[in-house]
Amino acid sequence: MPSLRYALVAYIESPVGEFVESLRRELHPSLPHLAAHLTLLPPRPLQGSEAAALQAIERICGQTEPFEVVLGDMKSFIPTTPTVYIPVAQGESRLRELHAQLNTQVLAFAEEWPYVPHVTIVQMATQPAAEQALAIARARWEQYSGSRRILLDRLTFVREDAPNCWVDLAPVSLGGSLVSP
């Protein structure tokens, strides 16, 4: 049995999050649809227990004040992967710092790719499909008139219980401690 994977995300519960979820459904209706989010720690096995991981997350996040990020222009990871995403244009360094602080001890993992703060829109099966999705996504993003700012004040520790089936384990406030769901 493969080991469980865990991640730390910031759900985007705002109009820009609704935009992302709608765009995902438009570009790839057959994919399982995850809530719009920024990933602080990409999926990984733990180097200890869930309880130890939560303690580490709470300690580090408790010392980090909430902050804002601003999303940039639509991009893709082509040719590395056929993925369309929105990078973080402002606040990227804060996310990188927090990622580095969290990617230690029980949460330590040698990630496959360098950490790039972003919101994934969709991962397609092929590069041509991703190029087509990117063109549509750019057009929709240019038409989007809402705020591209996201306040990061709460993160969520999640576990993958089945392929593409993530379960929320615990919300954690920045500048605070575990919060009740």
Question: Would you name each region that the model predicts?
Answer:
Residues 1-181:
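Histidine-dependent nucleotide/RNA phosphoesterase domain, centered on the 2H-phosphoesterase fold
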